[in-house]
């Protein structure tokens, strides 16, 4: 239903347009998928694009340093990394976790370390959200048919339910209706028919 596009084209633009957060209206934003190794992929996202830097150059050891921090601090690792960064108290951080269903999609019952990695990943988010003095925010996108799997994570599931938004599936006509109303421009009916035919033949477009 276009969750990723909605976040990146809509919410990110709004955030970058001086949206007020706990640490002012300046933001660092990253987006990643949990995949098979959510902690490692989080470290990759945190060490990319000067996310946690103001003027200094990132260190080549950042990824390894962050990974080590999570091993030592566990669920408080992200808070520790952020509080030691240049942007702490100066910028907000928005972390978009895309395709959160990756956590449940890949069978990991045969690998205890990978299963524990998933549990730690969820606890990292949980502990960070509950810390009111730290300006880290999360957007989590997940397929609706995986939502019930979050129920086994207790308070984490409860926290998500307080700010849950279901993005409805739009058919072609509804999609263009919303565009016309939101962006205030008209589209030739012939062009709409042509696009609809092309999309029905090649949905991947």
Language-model-derived ranges and their functions:
Residues 1-205:
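Amphipathic helix/helix-loop-helix segment enriched in hydrophobic residues with interspersed Lys/Arg
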